[in-house]
């Protein structure tokens, strides 16, 4: 398991966990959760890695190991979508070259 910090749309630091090699699958967790709770702890990420995929699991802002800014301006309605775009860009995930999976808040 690899963990790195990546800047969200406004520079907030987001923890991004990854495991495996192959076609990237970006996994977005649910509300009041984290990558550990939704994807790592239950083994979903490892199943994907074992099947030849690269599971990429950010902790969404204010969740898990990611920053939780106190400024309300850090949470516009489109914050999660903008963070996902920033992550894809930072990780060089080209449109059509990765799969996106969301659960609850991440959907």
Segments from the language model and where they lie:
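Short beta-strand element of the alpha/beta-hydrolase
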Residues: 23-30
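Structural signature of beta-strand start/N-cap positions in the alpha/beta core
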Residues: 24, 54, 96-99
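A short loop-to-beta-strand scaffold at the N-terminal edge of the catalytic core in hydrolase folds
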Residues: 9-19
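Gly/Ala-rich beta-loop-alpha elbow adjacent to hydrolase catalytic centers
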Residues: 102-106
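Conserved alpha/beta-hydrolase
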Residues: 48-67
